[in-house]
């Protein structure tokens, strides 16, 4: 193998080992553990979709009239990621966002989607994102994580 690749693998090995030893893995020992994990992790999936949209708004042109903005390479990278995340494919070859696919997987395994669906419903009803997050039945750590993303995105 390429010596550069070997050096790169060696340099990230300590971080990789730290990640692999993360306590979350000990919590996922059975279906119930996976269900509990996904009921919280779905907010990280939604957060990523929102952060990605913030990057697309900030680094590409999404306004009318369209004008070129920033680096073409940056636009390509961001839009390629957006395409993949917003236009995934399910097991029936139907287009679906990665977020919606995650929700579908949660439902198939019997995990509750009540809290994330309630949050999305509040947003669809016009409640500002910070208020919708605050009103959600979520642990404080999850609320803080989400609020941090939107504080960055809006400021």
Located regions from the model:
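Non-cleavable N-terminal signal-anchor transmembrane helices
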Residues: 1-16, 103, 112-117
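Alpha-helical bundle segments that constitute or directly flank the non-heme di-iron/ferroxidase center
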Residues: 4-19, 29-67, 84-89, 140-147
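Flexible, glycine- and charge-enriched loops at secondary-structure boundaries
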Residues: 5, 71, 95
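Short, well-ordered alpha-helical segments
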Residues: 70-76
